[in-house]
């Protein structure tokens, strides 16, 4: 069983968060999509995608799944890669 933390879990600025952001950005570019294209597919503003890609916004699991579907990558494979990275 894991250790119970007595302080909030840091997300933004961790190695895993940086890798997740880089992966999303790379997958979007590989798909030939612009930030505005992804934003429109998800009924969001372009700034929402930009904040995620700059690592300035946390990403929920549901948002990650929506991004993966809109961009066209396998979220399970992506998370396996991210999970191997140590913070």
Per-region residue spans from a language model:
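Short, basic-rich loop-to-helix N-cap that marks the start of a DNA-contacting helix
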Residues: 56-68
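Charged, amphipathic alpha-helical coiled-coil/dimerization segments
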Residues: 36, 53, 69-72
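N-terminal flexible/basic segments that precede or flank functional cores
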Residues: 1-26, 30, 69, 74-80, ...
